[in-house]
UniProtKB/Swiss-Prot annotation:
Name of the protein in question: DNA-directed RNA polymerase subunit alpha
Purpose of the protein: DNA-dependent RNA polymerase catalyzes the transcription of DNA into RNA using the four ribonucleoside triphosphates as substrates.
Keywords: Chloroplast, DNA-directed RNA polymerase, Nucleotidyltransferase, Plastid, Transcription, Transferase
HAMAP family recorded: RNApol_bact_RpoA (MF_00059)
UniProt domain comment: The N-terminal domain is essential for RNAP assembly and basal transcription, whereas the C-terminal domain is involved in interaction with transcriptional regulators and with upstream promoter elements.
InterPro entries listed in its UniProt record: DNA-dir_RNA_pol_insert, DNA-dir_RNA_pol_RpoA/D/Rpb3, DNA-dir_RpoA, RBP11-like, RNAP_asu_C, RNApol_insert_sf
UniProt subunit comment: In plastids the minimal PEP RNA polymerase catalytic core is composed of four subunits: alpha, beta, beta', and beta''. When a (nuclear-encoded) sigma factor is associated with the core the holoenzyme is formed, which can initiate transcription.
Single annotated GO MF: DNA-directed RNA polymerase activity
Similarity comment: Belongs to the RNA polymerase alpha chain family.
GO cellular component, one term: mitochondrion
Biological process annotations from GO: DNA-templated transcription
Annotated spans, Alpha C-terminal domain (alpha-CTD): 264-339
Taxonomic placement: Eukaryota, Viridiplantae, Streptophyta, Embryophyta, Tracheophyta
Length: 339
């Protein structure tokens, strides 16, 4: 972090990208500025964004490889120049781009002699290779070579204990960190009481997303971290201000479902699809990934079930509740809907 004195003028707080370039397929660079900030604010924003960029951005990588009957990772395979450990290290370096959630399967199946590169990986449709020229192994003889791979989207650095896997399956220490480096510098402007700061932020990524995309995701994650404090303030409002408002203390889908089961007339809940509820695309996709397709599926879930869904957030919970209240008012729920 660097501080310098520069001349400048006070203006409305704004940010912009002042430099963007692609150094290689696996190295993107972006430089951004945010100004004007009061003294000390640039440090606050810079530190928070740097931590969020390096530790909170999700990435996709290969987490496991299965070779067949290989006694240990230091073994060599006849006809292949690299050892199993070297192949695992090469697979660890493969950069993938995707929006998948959960674990997916991939594979490599080729016949030598030939070089094996990232383009030989057979991937699910939702996954894309950033640099297809990344090396994996060299087959020096005419042999058949197949590997089963496991792909996962996560964040940070994940390690697994090394074991002697008799089925030839070996974990790969996953580095789910699309942001390679972050640096920020602070420039002071003006004199006396008019002094303010400009924050310069530099971001390097591995090509699976652009620096601008990384900055947006990091900012979104920081906002999500502070949302509970805003909700706490709302919950602390006086009873007089809220006595006519209905805010469920918990996501009481299960309680609502119990009430619905008591009624036997009306439209079956399994005939109402979540497509009809006008949910946001993000919430809709979360539910679809969890095989929730109808209102019956949704109301059968508890709050804990929903919060266990990958990428499902507290605000998604509130959005679903508000949507149900909008389209299925309480009197209709009590008098019209049943199984």
């Amino acid at each position: 972090m660097v501080r310098e004195e520069v001349a400048g003028s006070t203006q409305t707080l704004q940010w912009k990208c002042v430099e963007s370039r692609v150094d290689s397929k696996r190295l993107y660079y972006g430089r951004f500025i945010l100004s004007p900030l009061r003294k000390g604010q640039a440090d606050t924003v810079g530190i928070a964004l740097r931590r969020a960029l390096l530790g909170e951005i999700e990435g996709t990588c290969i987490t496991r490889a299965k070779f067949g009957s290989v006694p240990h990772e230091y073994s060599t395979i006849a006809g292949i120049e690299e050892s199993v450990q070297e192949i695992l290290l090469n697979l660890k370096e493969i950069v993938l781009r995707s929006n998948l959630y959960g674990v997916r399967d991939a594979s490599i199946c080729v016949k030598g002699p030939r070089y094996i590169t990232a383009q030989d990986i057979i991937l699910p449709p939702s996954v894309e290779i950033v640099d297809t020229a990344q090396p994996i192994a060299n087959l020096x003889e005419p042999i058949d070579f197949c590997i089963d791979l496991q792909i996962k989207r996560d964040r940070g650095y994940q390690t697994e204990l090394r074991k002697n896997y008799q089925d030839g399956s070996y974990p790969i220490d996953a580095v789910s960190m699309p942001v390679r480096n972050v640096n920020y510098s602070i420039f002071s402007c003006g004199n006396g009481n008019e002094k303010h700061e400009i924050l310069f932020l530099e971001i390097w990524t591995n090509g699976s997303l652009t620096p601008k995309e990384a900055l947006y995701e990091a900012s979104r994650n920081l906002i999500d971290l502070f949302l509970p404090f805003l909700h706490a303030e709302e919950e602390g409002a006086s009873f007089e201000e809220n006595k006519n408002r209905f805010t469920p203390p918990l996501f009481t889908f299960q309680k609502r479902l119990t009430n619905l089961k008591k009624n036997k007339k009306g439209i079956p809940l399994n005939c109402i699809f979540i497509d009809q509820l006008e949910l946001t695309s993000r919430t809709y996709n979360c539910l679809k990934r969890a095989n929730i397709h109808t209102l019956l599926d949704l109301l059968s879930k508890t709050e804990e079930d929903l919060l266990r869904i990958d990428x499902f957030r507290m605000e998604d919970r509130k959005h679903i509740w508000d949507t149900l209240e909008k389209h299925l008012p309480i009197d209709l729920l009590k008098n019209k809907l049943s199984f």
